[in-house]
């Protein structure tokens, strides 16, 4: 098992900065998710940890040892890729066994370790099939077993569910969560999918344009986003964000007025609130809108309206019904809201 320390690491190509001043300690046995949009630097960060990319600045330590100059094979990490990376000429058994042969593990251990890894991902009945005879989910499980059989200090998983359909993603996600609990190996997982991040992680690192935006537990990041980028990236739907003016403790914008912000400074601000925290009303309220769309989600109905240049979503009961274009009120209180500085995007903390 291993603790990983990233000491102000950075990666640049000429004037382009891919990862900037990334500083973090990852605890032994922690499941850490690097989350962000394409091009944010999350995969580059993982590749630096693996040794597949050189570090431009800073240090990477695994178990207190600086590994900047170590080859990937000497870092004792195992990677699982989006593309599975299986050998088509080998059956499942030999694909799983291959890392043991490369690392010259005593042959007497091979069969037991392969069978144990295969059992963990429920592949015992597929050991003599070639990759072409497997489904996408089964291939990804072979890739997981091949990483498990190594018994590495660290698992690195780069968008391992991206090629799977929605149903397989759910079941494989649950399997990864279960394996993490069973194996107790430090794991770094890269994804652009905030649902994967929220369901799998002990902690989430949200990245954008090579910069860490926030580090915290999934609950922390959902309930207390550090800035408007995190607020708009986490949640389905994302947090509602409405620009307006704060004066004498009252937030005002088109068709909207919310009081109770006396401890915040006056100025141009952005109000944020979650869809499930506001309430739809047939009478006048803090926000008065015309319904833009209704979406039945099964357990609830999503009511969407336009406020200025923003779309605002609010969850209502599953049997809620109203005509498109009808006027409704949305009850919002200061206690469910966050205020962000409109210029910097940073969330205000109470004075």
Regions found by a protein language model. Give the residues of each.
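Pre-Walker A (P-loop) beta-loop-beta motif of ABC nucleotide-binding domains
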Residues: 22-33
């Amino acid at each position: 098992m291993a603790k990983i320390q990233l000491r102000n690491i950075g990666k640049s190509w000429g004037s382009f900065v891919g990862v900037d001043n990334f500083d973090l300690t990852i605890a032994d046995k922690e499941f850490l998710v690097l989350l962000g949009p394409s091009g944010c630097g999350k995969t580059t960060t993982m590749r630096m940890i693996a040794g597949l990319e050189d570090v431009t600045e800073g240090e990477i330590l695994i178990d207190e040892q600086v590994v900047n100059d170590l080859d990937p094979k000497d870092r004792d990490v195992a990677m699982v890729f989006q593309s599975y990376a299986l050998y088509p000429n080998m059956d499942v058994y030999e694909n799983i066994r291959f890392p043991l042969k490369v690392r010259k593990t005593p042959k007497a251990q091979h069969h037991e370790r392969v069978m144990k890894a295969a059992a963990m991902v429920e592949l015992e009945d597929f050991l003599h099939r070639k990759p072409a005879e497997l489904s996408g989910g089964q291939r990804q499980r072979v890739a997981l077993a091949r990483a498990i059989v190594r018994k590495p200090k660290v698992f690195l998983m780069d968008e391992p569910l991206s090629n799977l359909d929605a149903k397989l993603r759910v079941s494989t996600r649950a399997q990864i969560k279960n394996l993490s609990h069973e194996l107790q190996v430090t794991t770094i997982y890269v994804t652009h999918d905030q649902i994967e991040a929220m369901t799998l992680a002990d902690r989430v690192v949200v990245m954008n344009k090579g910069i860490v935006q926030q580090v915290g537990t999934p609950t922390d990041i959902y309930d207390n986003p550090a800035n408007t980028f995190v607020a708009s990236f986490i949640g389905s739907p994302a947090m509602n964000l409405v620009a307006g003016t704060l004066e004498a403790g009252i937030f005002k914008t088109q068709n909207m007025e919310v009081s109770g912000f006396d401890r915040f400074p006056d100025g141009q601000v952005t109000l944020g609130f979650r869809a499930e925290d506001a309430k739809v009303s047939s009478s006048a309220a803090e926000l008065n809108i015309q319904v833009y769309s209704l979406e039945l989600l099964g357990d609830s109905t999503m009511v969407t309206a336009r406020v200025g240049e923003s779309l605002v979503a609010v969850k209502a009961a599953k049997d809620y019904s109203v005509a498109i274009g009808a006027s409704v009120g949305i009850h919002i209180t200061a206690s469910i809201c966050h205020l962000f500085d409109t210029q910097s995007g940073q969330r205000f903390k109470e004075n």
